[in-house]
Curated annotation (Swiss-Prot):
Induction and repression of expression: Subject to nitrogen catabolite repression.
Primary gene name: DAL3
Function: Catalyzes the catabolism of the allantoin degradation intermediate (S)-ureidoglycolate, generating urea and glyoxylate. Involved in the utilization of allantoin as secondary nitrogen source when primary sources are limiting.
GO cellular component, one term: membrane
Protein's recorded name: Ureidoglycolate lyase
Lyase found in the keyword field: yes
Higher taxonomy: Eukaryota, Fungi, Dikarya, Ascomycota, Saccharomycotina
GO process annotations (BP): allantoin catabolic process; purine nucleobase metabolic process
Organism per entry: Saccharomyces cerevisiae (strain ATCC 204508 / S288c)
EC number: 4.3.2.3
């Protein structure tokens, strides 16, 4: 059995697994907050996340996921509070040929909205010794690095659902689905996250 305690998502904590888009974190690091974009009505943050493609597809897809919280996760979560809620991970997946970016829609920067679970790879399988979990705010997006193992989206909070717009390159070859997604399954309780 592997158990990991979820931590707060930051650029540094996630960098081994991909990149994040975190506007408040990016803006807090800027020297010059001049609104130099859109005729002075916006701050432009450049190159906040990397997109990679090793698939045969030359055009990325925008997909939409409407995700629902599991009953035990349908409650208010706050950053930094250890509420000791246990969540079992039953599958990790990877996309061997593309990064995958999840952009949450409709939640605020004050809300813990979802949980991200990631692991590095060893021998074409998830290396559970590198497993980490992160609580994400409603205005933080994640880009899983090329081939990074991750759990499907895990929604937190009292809202009925959370929508994600998702950017990925996919071949959509019905004869070779493993080119787009590979899964590793676990029994209930084998891999647990404490939120």
């Amino acid at each position: 059995m592997v158990t990991v305690v979820a931590e707060t998502l930051t650029k540094e904590s996630f960098e081994e697994y991909g990149t994040i888009i975190s506007p408040d974190e990016e803006i807090s690091r800027m020297q010059n907050l001049e609104k130099g974009a859109n005729q002075g009505t916006a701050i432009k943050l450049l190159q906040v996340s990397q997109v990679e493609n090793k698939s045969t597809s030359k055009v990325p897809n925008w997909n939409l996921f409407r995700c629902f919280p599991q009953p035990h996760l349908n409650r208010v979560f706050t950053q930094g509070s250890n509420q000791a809620i246990s969540h079992s991970i039953k599958v990790l997946e990877k996309h061997p040929c593309s990064t995958q970016t999840f952009v949450p829609m409709g939640r605020t920067s004050a809300e813990v909205a979802y949980l991200v679970v990631v692991a590095k790879e060893i021998g074409n399988k998830p290396d559970l010794s590198t497993l980490r979990a992160f609580t994400c705010l409603g205005n933080q997006a994640v880009t899983y690095g090329l081939g990074t193992w991750h759990a499907p989206m895990i929604v937190l909070g009292k809202e009925e659902h959370l929508d994600f717009s998702v950017l990925i390159y996919e071949s959509l070859d019905p004869d070779r689905p493993e080119k787009d997604c590979v899964e590793e399954h676990y029994s209930d309780g084998d891999v647990c996250i404490i939120i």
